[in-house]
């Protein structure tokens, strides 16, 4: 089952997929290897926001106003919009749907990286983290990467989210809805061929909720895939050397991982 993750010299994978209800391991390859995960750890920022909501420290209706210092382009929509403020709920949706960098920075300013780190530690995770704001160019002394993590910890998070172990059921649904709006279905999720812009429902009997991360040397995808009978939590991360372009080789393997998950869902 791990053969697909050993096919490319110079590419490191961390991968794991488990049946949420039985614990059966669908596949596993270096699940505890720590890799750069690009935007994946924005999940922990959203998690911290919901934990603060539970503690009465944050309301989803609270409006946050962006500043010029938080502005960053590339992924997302907010930098293209005139609207200067959004509710925390809508900022979460921008992050979940489009991995919005501007929205991420605004929410980090409200919550704080230290609080995110505390919530990650409370989850019991030691190898996964959101390290910094989105910045470009990255200044001297800033963390070298936005986030890092292991397939073991992120697949565990997704399993716990599916089981409503992280929050009460209504709060879990907020998180799942944020992530379920994700428009990037190009990696593991591509095997299921969902409509990238609207797939919070069963498509050909399968449902996918996921978050991705993309950088010059990173492709990462973690999520939940399920039918009416089975549920699988997964994480597949790939890193390669700077100055090389391995995307066209890596992406078919990410899709193949989705095929292994689908095979289990329908076994």
Residue ranges and their predicted role:
Residues 47-55, 109, 156-163, 262-263:
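Short glycine/serine- and small hydrophobic-enriched flexible loop segments
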Residues 10-13, 108-163:
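Mid-domain, small-residue-enriched loop/turn segments at the edges of structured enzyme/sensor domains
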Residues 71-105:
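Conserved catalytic neighborhood of penicillin-recognizing serine enzymes
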Residues 55-81:
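Short, glycine/proline-biased beta-turn/loop segments that scaffold the active-site neighborhood
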Residues 23, 36-64, 234:
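Active-site SXXK
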Residues 11-34:
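Short, conserved catalytic-motif segment at the N-terminal edge
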Residues 1-5, 9, 26, 164-186, ...:
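Structured C-terminal helix/loop/strand segments within mature extracytoplasmic catalytic/sensor domains
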Residues 28-35, 77, 81, 141-144:
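A short glycine/serine-rich beta->alpha loop
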């Amino acid at each position: 089952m791990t053969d697909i993750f050993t096919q490319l010299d110079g590419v490191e994978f961390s991968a794991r997929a488990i049946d949420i209800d039985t614990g059966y391991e669908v596949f596993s390859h270096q699940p505890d290897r720590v890799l750069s995960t690009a935007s994946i750890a924005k999940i922990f920022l959203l998690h911290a926001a919901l934990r603060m909501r539970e503690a009465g420290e944050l309301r989803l209706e609270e409006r946050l106003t962006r500043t010029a210092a938080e502005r960053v382009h590339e992924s997302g929509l907010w930098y293209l919009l005139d609207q200067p403020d959004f509710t925390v709920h809508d900022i979460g949706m921008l992050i979940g749907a489009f991995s919005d960098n501007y929205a991420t920075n605004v929410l980090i300013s409200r919550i704080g990286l230290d609080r995110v780190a505390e919530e990650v530690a409370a989850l019991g995770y030691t190898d996964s983290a959101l390290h910094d704001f989105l910045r470009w160019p990255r200044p001297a002394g800033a963390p070298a990467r936005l986030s890092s993590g292991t397939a073991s910890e992120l697949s565990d998070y997704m399993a716990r989210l599916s089981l409503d172990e992280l929050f009460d059921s209504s709060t879990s649904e907020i998180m799942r809805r944020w992530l379920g709006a994700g428009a990037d279905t190009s990696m593991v999720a591509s095997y299921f061929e969902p409509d990238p812009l609207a797939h919070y429902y069963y498509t050909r009997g399968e449902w996918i909720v996921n978050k991705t991360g993309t950088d010059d040397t990173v492709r990462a995808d973690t999520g939940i895939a399920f039918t009416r009978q089975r549920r699988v939590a997964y994480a597949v991360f790939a890193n390669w050397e700077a100055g090389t372009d391995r995307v066209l080789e890596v992406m078919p393997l990410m899709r193949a991982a989705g095929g292994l998950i689908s095979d289990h869902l329908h076994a």
